[in-house]
């Protein structure tokens, strides 16, 4: 399979290890982290929430190990879509590629919509769709200049988020153990909220149900694979970035959950608008709500920035594989696939539908479209690594020649594949998440049909012409 393009249509390898790490964090630390943690604590209880995030982190760890082997062996911009086409089947690669592209393009729309709603706190008289247009234009410019401009902007977006999270963990932890006085002279809670109503107040089953939400919270870390095609020295930068992303993401998430669960009673955690705001207000930090509104706004734009980059590169790679219009596989003089960027942004501008419909209605429809793609992506990564290793050994390849090896093969990849599949199946048992299956499954079936009716026949005809 041809993964290289003509000299005039190539991406540029300008990303360093720090860029890859921040791009991955940019995709994962969003509203699900800043707003969704309270729901997890409320449902699973304090200890149950911590355990849920540890298990979710373990699934992320297994998936990223599989991605590391593939991305080092094949550092291409198509990443797991290219791997799926080559090692699973062209039909699956086609269907998954379009699902994953649509998922991230729609995620951009969701982030623009959420950002517009946040701006109404400060500018209530300006319509949401106007802010959507402003933020869409900003993200388009950052992605259109150069790949390095995108990477640098994402580096600083993610840096702001990390700084706030570190301050939250330090200040919240200090207040939790009485090192900082609480507002109103309240006593430090220490660890009382973890055991005052029992270790699992809603039972083990409640903790298992929250795994669906928790696993989605970690998704976005796989963007390292998409950026591999534009990274300097991928054999060194990708393994380093994967290790940094896995451990630092897990530490940020788990320590934040411990602080929130320690500071806020679990019954109240799902009621407050943002648990981060509630903790900052307990400590007595002025303008806590406005500060977090700004941080969440940055988080939204960061996710949109990473998502626009990822979906553009997936579409670009598919075009060069004959799975999308050929023009989408071209880059400009700066190495930016502009046509793919324009098409992706056109889908992301679905957020502008808020001019004609209620913002909440548009949000739910877009969220259902985006819901399944990332989970299918993790399954695809695990399965592609298993199929790649089998083919590699069958064709006489030596394991010691692989620059990055998934340890304990095939045990860890199979565990990752199984756990990711269980999470996907679990969507059917959650009424709020079930709509993701209703949208995602028919979409993939339609893509399969299109591949066999149109794409496969066209590729066969092209091969015959070449002969």
Swiss-Prot record:
Induction section of the entry: Part of the rocDEF operon. Expression is sigma L dependent, induced by arginine, ornithine or proline.
InterPro entries, A to Z: AA-permease/SLC12A_dom, Amino_acid_permease_CS
Pfam family, one: AA_permease
Compartments, record wording: Cell membrane
Gene3D superfamilies from the UniProt entry: Amino acid/polyamine transporter I
Origin: domain of life: Bacteria
Membrane topology: Multi-pass membrane protein
Transmembrane segments: 21-41, 47-67, 87-107, 122-142, 162-182, 207-227, 246-266, 283-303, 336-356, 361-381, 409-429, 435-455
Keywords tagged on the record: Amino-acid transport, Arginine metabolism, Cell membrane, Membrane, Transmembrane, Transmembrane helix, Transport
GO cellular-component term (any): membrane
An annotated GO BP: arginine metabolic process
Gene Ontology molecular function terms on file: amino acid transmembrane transporter activity
Homology family: Belongs to the amino acid-polyamine-organocation (APC) superfamily. Amino acid transporter (AAT) (TC 2.A.3.1) family.
Role: Putative transport protein involved in arginine degradative pathway. Probably transports arginine or ornithine.
Database matches in PANTHER family: GABA PERMEASE, GAMMA-AMINOBUTYRIC ACID PERMEASE
Protein name, entry field: Amino-acid permease RocE
Source species of the chain: Bacillus subtilis (strain 168)
The gene coding this protein: rocE
